[in-house]
Amino acid sequence: MTQDELKQLVGQAAADYVNATVPEGAVIGVGTGSTANCFIDALAGNKARYRGAVSSSLATTARLQTHGIKVFDLNEIDSLPVYVDGADEIDRSGAMIKGGGGALTREKIVASVSDVFVCIADASKLVETLGTFPLPIEVVPMARTAIGRRVTALGGVPVVRVTKEGVPFITDNGNEIIDVKGLRISDPRTLETHINAWPGVVTVGLFAARGANLCLLGTDTGVETIEYSKG
């Protein structure tokens, strides 16, 4: 299967999982990116079952609204039974690198209040050690250079994310992103805590403190379900 076919496969599997496990009338948390879009498209066929969704980005909001799915502000919602999102990398413990699409902060917020985090990914995203994919850090613009120096001291190579026009990429929150290359992340939870404590960091794209509960992994032989123990 092509990568796009694998994304569609896990998007449908996630919709099937949500339809089978989430009660009618619930509000669902939805992530950002091409794999999350496949989930939205698959979920749309059964949208009447749900009150709506909480979105993690402006792009996801637009996708949901295109399908006629009501989008709620997180402040309006008491609970989210499930959050479904992709990952740039996921390891055997359920820790992830996320933020390739630039929505890491809102993704982390929505994930943090969900009961179950379902990661959907193709098999290429499953790794033994995180770090081959550059680690995104959302930063307040005035702190960009200072954060870059701290990254270098860790042994990483900081690269300011830019648009195709060559100007800094700006997140939905009005901040910039540093992509860190060259890290081998053996202890993602500790590194997440460490980087998040730097002044000027909005959040780092490590999802270890709140990792996935479940991964639906698209392979050439079908969808593999990986469950992670949390505690």
Swiss-Prot record:
Pfam families: Rib_5-P_isom_A (PF06026). Keywords: Isomerase. Substrate binds at residues 32-35, 85-88, 98-101, 125. GO terms for cellular component: cytosol. The keyword Nucleotide-binding does not apply. InterPro entries: NagB/RpiA_transferase-like, Ribose5P_isomerase_typA_subgr, Ribose5P_isomerase_type_A. The keyword Isomerase applies. Its EC number is 5.3.1.6. It catalyses: aldehydo-D-ribose 5-phosphate = D-ribulose 5-phosphate. One of its GO terms (biological process) is D-ribose metabolic process. CDD domains: RPI_A. GO terms for molecular function: ribose-5-phosphate isomerase activity. The active site is at residue 107. Homodimer. HAMAP family: Rib_5P_isom_A. Catalyzes the reversible conversion of ribose-5-phosphate to ribulose 5-phosphate. This is Ribose-5-phosphate isomerase A. It comes from Paraburkholderia phytofirmans (strain DSM 17436 / LMG 22146 / PsJN). The lineage of its organism: Bacteria, Pseudomonadati, Pseudomonadota, Betaproteobacteria, Burkholderiales. The gene is rpiA.
